[in-house]
Amino acid sequence: SPYLLQHSSNPVWWQEWSAEIIQYAVDGKKPLFVSVGYATCHWCHVMAAEAFSDIDTANFLNSHFICIKVDREQRPDIDQFMMQYLTALSGNGGWPLNVFLTADLRPIYALTYAPVRSSGPQQSFLSIAKKVHEYYEKNADDIEPFITKEVHPPIAGEESLVKNLLSYYDPDYGGFDPGQKFPPHSTLLYLLYFLCVENNPDVQTICRKTLDAMRLGGLNDHLQGGIFRYCVDRQWTIPHFEKMLYDQAMALWCYSLAYKVIGKSEYKKMAESIVRCLDDCFADNGLFISAHDADTEHVEGATYVWSYTELKDFLGPDEFKRFCASYDIDEQGNFEGLIHLIRKNDVSLYDIEDKLLFLRNKRAQPARDNKIICGINALVAIAMIQAGRNLERPELEEKAAQIIRRLIDLFWDGKTLGHSYYNGAKQNKNFLFDAAALLTAISMIYENDASWNTLMTTIAAYVESFRDGEKWVESRAADFQQVFASWFDHPIPSSVSLAEMGRTRVALLTGKETKFKSYRASYQADFFNITVMMNNGLFHVISSKSAVAWSELSPNTLQTRGETQTDCYRGTCRVLKEK
């Protein structure tokens, strides 16, 4: 893991999570200090450079705890357990996620970032660690276990979903958060599919305003394509500069669908710029790496921002005038005296943007997390399939099929599905998210080519192995306790939502009955609610002897092969005339 390697020079004696190291702690009656993060996490870098590089802190941790580093992207089950405890304890979450536990995994205390030195009311990490150890020494036998529960959003009525989303919506700037603005991928997808069923002017406004704010503002990399993780302000001005693969996949799906549903050409342009970013920045031997760091040489955003003088001197007078007419260029800057590029309009400036990108590429670049994650790559395949259909670019669908074949070759052994691949080594832990995302992708490519049927059926059965009665579990890893799968659809679809979509699609495509599902609370379970639409008859299921061109179909459509051409929708099937 690139993340674990980032901490290899710390004086803290970090261990990797394993059954053996947990048993060692049990045998030695020593508590655990578990720190969870990921390779492109800014505050993880800060803590690595501060507290975890401090000799006094390291000596105390090494003497009194077994210290374990966890890459959350490699062990989502451990991350989810620790995060549930942190949020139950404090009401907040985040990374680095630092948890003190007994050797038998009873949590003692949890926190995110803490400085190396105390400052006013903010305690140093070392002082916190000392208090935790003192508490443990006095109360070890009385510390209660933390029992994880299946936390699912409440059932909601169909009529309340859009109404509730309207109440969360920011009418001034778009999006749904009152402060920091995260791209609301699943919410946008739900609303866009809703527009396929009902042309609601308020929903049109929400989608347009949010999609335009995301593509014109600071979330978008206007030179390279692709989007950053989130914006730190309500106005979508300054991003947290990391680029995550999952954001590119979800944004590609959103913008291609928005083009198909709303018809605005700028959404097609945005989708195609994300494809370019994937090819130029994330592609690796037929698959895609996980992320690009927010920092360049320990400075956040250094690769992406410009000085006013730099822009003015590099561009010719006419170019600079044209550039300032389309970009919001202030001599005082908008980010620590420098300029992060934000568009004012959609005037084409390809010549200038390519020139600036050429210069930018000569700078030092952010570190890359070169880990290949099965489920996130499956999300890319899903997005490529949908973009191919929505943009009428069938080569993207073929590219998606190649991604799926590569994932099967790399991760599927005929019985179980591996999780990640890095530097020649494959991690064979099995997670619902990977299986569910892959099943959903296969079910989409099956619509083009029925020869995928056997594999689709096999992976569908594998997904069902993650059921525990009526509940889904994220993993059955032998070195950790069972954790129920997440329902929360941000920033990406949850494991539960992907599993339900995959199994619903397979049922509809193979002529099996589906049971009525209830909608869940909006904003928490928006991707799940797309599956409810599908399950409850709000997606067309077209059956025909030969494939119907996707350009002729509504986006809320599945299609499969049959002897007669039928369209099943809202509980009624009608025979269509053969063309």
How should these model regions be labeled?
Residues S1-A383, A387-N390, F516-K579:
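Replace the tail clause
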Residues T40, I227, A251, M384, ...:
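Extended, hydrophobic alpha-helical segments in both membrane/secreted and soluble proteins
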Residues D280-A283, D409-A436, A441-G571:
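Long, polar/charge-rich, low-hydrophobicity segments
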Residues T205, K209, K269, S273, ...:
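Primarily a tetratricopeptide repeat
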Residues K264, Q386-A400, Y446-N453, R505, ...:
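Acidic, serine/threonine/proline-rich low-complexity intrinsically disordered regions
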